[in-house]
Design a protein with these regions (language model features):
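Substrate-binding cleft of secreted/luminal carbohydrate-active enzymes
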Residues: 37-51, 75-78, 83, 246, ...
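Aromatic-lined carbohydrate-recognition surfaces of secreted/lumenal glycan-active proteins
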Residues: 175-234, 284-298
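Extracellular cysteine-rich, disulfide-stabilized repeat modules
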Residues: 376-378, 382-396
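Aromatic- and acid-rich polysaccharide-binding/catalytic face
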Residues: 75-77, 81-90, 94, 140, ...
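Alpha-helical scaffolding within the catalytic cores
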Residues: 64-65, 120, 226-239, 270-280, ...
């Protein structure tokens, strides 16, 4: 074995090698970065009524589930729907004649909501050490004025009506301006205080809001493979939401109109997962990514129509290969007893074997691409990817394109520098240049991306010795 020794001055604050990712996606990880994860598959289907001959055993295929496949009191997940959680203000089915808890967020009682929400959280998650995913599912209204189109336009209309009643002598321009600000302020208070409550009560859970980030549904129709710049701006403007989240829950659901379009579905799913990773990198590097999907196109009306293998490849398989934290398979409880046999047959004959095949291919990639020392992942979506299309997230202390190097701490010298002196050393002699920062977001955005990363520089203090062994 050939040993190459290199002395590098690295500030004591870093202690061990920091995470460095080069332009082709290869990484090395020191103790200051988390270990690479394998993608879990979570069964968020309320199939607990399925018993006896129709009992559904998902664990034999490596799928995680709550105990007895219940939605309450489990260890893997908890989900809170606006209709039965706290006192969320909304118009039922966006109908102004059926306001719930005030209808508009501006008219809701935040304190009453938080008091009831605390009871609901403690009931649904009795374990104070719960470390699963906690999903806040509020879909009746959207937390931003610019996202309130289509059926959600009612919240704009009613906000303007409310402002006009409060300030009848204002001009229409003043009324519309204030209505937008008032609506967004109320939305942010409800969303932020709710997730803060959850984090305070169950601090180990991964908290976030379902359906965010978002992407335009027509991506791919004009040969593009990314979410539009408009939707990227929408997501950038939700920086206040990302600042409070510890998990991101995008949805790659397919519907009956998608049945015969697996290629289009692949582009859609890949674009949203890529956009979610962009949000994570720019705004919440500590957030986990849990992608929601289904296995039925419409479990309400056609429960016997399940995803084809091509559409499994466009959703679940792609998310696993892009190495998200988990893929969450969701379904409704409606008519669940009559659907038990259908679910069991699909699980045993299609979904389960498909997941096993994906797992075997990813294990082969780990061994051959990453030398068994890290996780394979696709940096970007690609149909029928070859081994060389994958990159590696290496287990510490390994690093390199194929996790072929091993880093070892030898010692320290002198005192710890001040945080302002902290720099990542230039090790370009051994690695390709780091990938460009994503912090340069358009000045037209309402918010600027925070600087989450250190810049390389020559102003380094006394550091430690690093031995690189190949």
């Amino acid at each position: 074995m050939k040993t190459v020794k290199l002395k590098i001055c690295i500030p004591i604050l870093l202690k061990l090698i920091f995470l460095i990712e080069n332009s082709n996606g290869a990484q090395y990880v020191g103790t200051s970065a988390s270990q690479p994860n394998r993608t879990d598959v979570v069964w968020m289907v309320p199939s607990w009524p399925c018993v006896d001959n129709d009992s559904i055993d998902v664990q034999k295929f490596g799928i995680l589930q709550n105990e007895d496949q219940e939605f309450v009191g489990g260890q893997e997940f908890a989900i809170f729907y606006e209709h039965s959680f706290g006192k969320v203000p909304y118009f039922k089915a966006q109908n102004v004649s059926d306001p719930q808890n005030g209808g508009l967020p501006q008219l809701g009682d935040l304190q009453a909501h938080l008091e009831q929400a605390e009871i609901d959280i403690k009931t649904t998650i009795p374990d104070e050490n719960f470390s699963g995913i906690a999903v806040l599912d509020i879909e009746e209204f959207r937390p931003a004025w610019e996202l309130s189109w289509g059926v959600f336009q009612v919240y704009k209309t009613e906000s303007i009506r409310l402002t006009r009643q409060q300030y009848p002598y204002w001009s229409e321009k003043q009324i519309e301006w204030y209505a937008e600000k008032d609506y967004e302020k109320a939305c942010q208070k409800f969303f932020i205080e709710t997730i803060r409550l959850g984090k305070r009560l169950r601090p180990n859970a991964k908290w976030g809001y379902y359906l965010f980030p978002k992407c335009n549904g027509d991506v791919g129709q004009k040969q593009e493979n990314e979410c539009s710049t408009l939707f990227q701006k929408f997501n950038d403007n939700l920086i206040w939401l990302w600042a409070e989240s510890t998990a991101l829950f995008p949805s790659i659901y397919l519907y009956p109109t998608h049945k015969q379009a697996p290629d289009f579905n692949f582009i859609n799913s890949g674009a949203l997962i890529t956009e979610t990773k962009r949000i994570k990198m720019n705004y919440c590097p500590g957030c986990e990514i849990h992608v929601f999907t289904k296995i039925e196109y419409n479990p309400y009306n056609t429960p016997d129509e399940f995803y084809s293998k091509q559409n499994l490849a466009s959703t679940i398989d792609l998310a696993i290969k892009m190495n998200v934290n988990s893929v969450v398979i969701w379904s409704t409880s409606q008519s669940i007893r009559s659907r038990c046999g259908l679910l069991q047959t699909y699980l045993d004959n299609t979904l389960g074997p498909y997941l096993q095949l994906t797992d075997r291919s990813m294990e082969k990639c780990r061994q051959e691409r990453c030398e068994g020392r890290g996780e394979c992942y696709l940096p970007r979506p690609k149909t029928n990817p070859a081994l060389y299309n994958f990159a590696c997230r290496c287990e510490r202390p390994y690093f390199g394109k194929s996790c072929e190097y091993r880093g070892r701490r030898i010692g320290y010298s002198k005192s710890r520098p001040k945080p302002s002196q902290t720099r990542i050393p230039d090790v370009s002699a051994y690695f390709r240049p780091a990938a460009p920062s994503f912090s340069s977001i358009s000045e037209s955005n309402r918010y600027n991306a925070p600087n989450q990363y250190y810049n390389k520089g020559s102003n380094v203090g006394n550091g430690q010795k690093i031995e690189l062994i190949k």
